[in-house]
């Protein structure tokens, strides 16, 4: 009873601390947005005392109102545009999927989208998804060859309705069928499940991050990796059991980033989900405990806080940051095209109205520059080594490896990149049955595996130079750098329903666990890593585990280190200095 009372007092104190955000804080919460209705809609007379106390604690932490009436809110009540404004912005918009057969078709489609300033949602080796108003379809088809005028299918024909319903509703998501306080493990899981039942606005995410660092201070710290153009901090959670590294050996760090593109809400939710699973399982799971002892894990839920807030307040499909450009009516820079390495790639983007506008010079996108400076500071002044970089995006279910700027330049560690990526994709397939394709990140590459030949397609949707993926791989020599495009394959696109938050989070948690297992090596062979996979199958009839093992040829910790040393020699084979003048060097 005494321990239970102590836990309650700690939670109450945490609520008070979290609510007391300094007035001068650089984190600027957005106007009040309809929060997730968690608990208060339950009749008070049906609650047990402990449930009411728990509800009050969570409501105090997250600022959840005490009562709501069913139905959609008005603009004044919820800070969200009513349906009339949604219809005014997106009323006739649809999403079309084009199937490409050859390079000429790809070039024609790319040129047409440039001329009409269309929003390319996805461009893969199999399809290209384009958002446009219905009245623009004849103009687009008029610019295309005859073979493409019938090579498309409607993917989303009710875009405005899907956009409106993508925001959290006023439907309560309480604990109707859940008992009162049970074991601490189960209670922790229930607490996490509440947060991930819907997408959350930035203000709630920041409060949640503060809560995590307060409740789990032994292995969680809230840090900032920079400040956005509008003055918001870019918060991150650093997980690990070590303090400042004073040893000669660099502290190995895994970095996971989401929300570079504001409309990709699932990437932000997934970063927080993976972080929460590692936080909650530390000390309970041998595998997770080992990962937090061996590495620092840094999670940045949204690199683009200004754009993310804007998607909640004004434009659900906003992609770029909110930085002014040379055209007053076309603000925003694509933060995944603003990095210095091979900036703007093979095609120059000079139109600020483009969704892929990379700025007028490298690192003009402020948030990208801030993250780059933080990473350089960590490696140069804090004795850290970023050994893995996971850049989460949506959609199309792909695991992409460098380089993105060109399909003709091969990364010096191509074999390792492909092998690990295939193992991660296999882990996803064997646990959640979802298929993630593995390929190079350079846009528009199509591989004919049956003919053992490949052909380059003209990139549809803009240049792929200046990416974070290439910068971390080249500049910091982060060998295991991946851009992962999450669910789905186009049925919902960027408007993925909240029911997919937890399943997608489980997939990336499994990816993080398997990647961590690979990085640790055979020194942790006594740990049953498979036991911690989420939604994992059991064992085969003969008792063998059915999931993938990423330990290649028994490579242990020393094997990984020796591989890193060997890679340093491979980097020297490429003369980057003469050809890539934008690079800042150690």
Curated annotation (Swiss-Prot):
Swiss-Prot/TrEMBL GO biological process terms: cell wall organization; proteolysis
Cofactor binding annotation: Binds 1 zinc ion per subunit.
Sorted UniProt keywords: Cell wall biogenesis/degradation, Disulfide bond, Glycoprotein, Metal-binding, Secreted, Signal, Vacuole, Zinc
Protein's cellular compartments: Vacuole; Secreted
Cystine residue pairs: 330-353
Record-linked InterPro entries: M14A-like_propep (IPR036990), Peptidase_M14 (IPR000834)
Disordered: annotated span: 535-562
Coiled coil start-end: none
Sugar-bearing residue positions: 158, 377
Annotated propeptide span(s): 21-170
Ranges annotated as biased composition (Basic and acidic residues): 541-555
Molecular function, one GO term: zinc ion binding
Residue span(s) of domain Peptidase M14: 198-519
Name recorded for this polypeptide: Inactive metallocarboxypeptidase ecm14
Organism: Aspergillus terreus (strain NIH 2624 / FGSC A1156)
């Amino acid at each position: 009873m005494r321990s239970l009372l102590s836990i309650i007092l700690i939670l109450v104190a945490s609520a008070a601390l979290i609510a007391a955000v300094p007035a001068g804080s650089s984190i600027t919460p957005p106007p009040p947005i309809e929060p997730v209705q968690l608990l208060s809609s339950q009749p008070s007379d049906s609650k047990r005392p402990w449930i009411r106390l728990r509800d009050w604690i969570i409501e105090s932490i997250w600022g959840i109102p005490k009562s709501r009436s069913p139905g959609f809110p008005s603009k004044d009540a919820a800070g969200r545009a009513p349906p009339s404004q949604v219809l005014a912005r997106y009323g006739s918009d649809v999403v079309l999927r084009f199937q490409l057969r050859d390079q000429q078709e790809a070039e024609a489609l790319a040129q047409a989208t440039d001329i009409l300033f269309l929003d390319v949602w996805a461009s893969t080796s199999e399809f290209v998804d384009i958002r446009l108003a219905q009245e623009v379809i004849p103009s687009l088809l008029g610019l295309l060859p005859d073979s493409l005028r019938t090579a498309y299918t409607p993917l989303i024909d009710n875009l405005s309705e899907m956009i409106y319903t993508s925001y959290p509703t006023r439907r309560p998501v309480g604990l109707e069928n859940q008992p009162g306080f049970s074991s601490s493990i189960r209670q922790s899981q229930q607490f996490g499940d509440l947060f991930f039942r819907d997408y959350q606005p930035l203000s709630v995410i920041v409060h949640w991050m503060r809560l995590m660092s307060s409740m789990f201070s032994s292995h969680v710290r809230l840090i900032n990796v920079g400040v956005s153009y509008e003055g918001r901090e870019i918060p991150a959670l650093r997980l690990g059991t070590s303090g400042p590294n004073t040893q000669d050996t660099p502290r190995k760090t895994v970095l996971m980033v989401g929300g570079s593109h504001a409309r990709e809400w699932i990437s932000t939710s997934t970063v927080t989900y993976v972080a929460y699973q590692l936080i909650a399982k530390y000390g309970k799971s041998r595998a997770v405990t080992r990962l937090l002892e061996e590495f620092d894990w840094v999670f940045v839920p949204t690199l683009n806080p200004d754009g993310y807030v804007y998607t909640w307040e004004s434009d659900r499909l906003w992609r770029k940051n909110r930085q002014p450009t040379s055209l007053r009516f076309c603000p925003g820079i694509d933060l995944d095209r603003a990095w210095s390495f091979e900036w703007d790639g093979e095609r120059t983007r000079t139109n600020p109205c483009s969704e892929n506008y990379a700025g007028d010079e490298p690192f003009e996108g402020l948030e990208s520059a801030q993250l780059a400076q933080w990473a350089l500071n960590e490696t140069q002044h804090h004795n850290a080594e970023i050994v893995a970089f996971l850049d989460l995006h949506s959609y199309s279910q792909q695991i992409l490896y460098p380089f993105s700027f060109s399909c003709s330049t091969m990364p010096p560690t191509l074999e390792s990149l492909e092998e690990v990526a295939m193992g991660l994709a296999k882990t996803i397939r064997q646990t959640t049955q979802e298929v993630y394709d593995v390929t190079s990140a350079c846009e528009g590459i199509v591989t004919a595996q049956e003919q053992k030949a490949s052909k380059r397609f003209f990139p549809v949707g803009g240049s792929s130079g200046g990416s974070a993926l290439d910068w971390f791989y080249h500049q910091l020599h982060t060998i295991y750098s991946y851009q992962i495009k999450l669910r789905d394959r186009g049925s919902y696109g960027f408007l993925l329903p909240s029911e997919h938050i937890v399943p997608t989070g489980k997939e990336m948690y499994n990816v993080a666990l398997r990647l961590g297992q690979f990085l640790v090596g055979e020194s942790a062979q006594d740990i049953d890593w498979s036991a911690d996979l989420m939604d994992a199958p059991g064992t085969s009839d003969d008792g063998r585990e059915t999931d993938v093992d990423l330990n290649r040829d028994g490579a242990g910790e020393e094997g990984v280190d020796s591989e890193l040393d060997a890679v340093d020699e491979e980097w020297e084979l490429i003369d980057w200095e003469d050809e890539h003048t934008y690079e800042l060097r150690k």
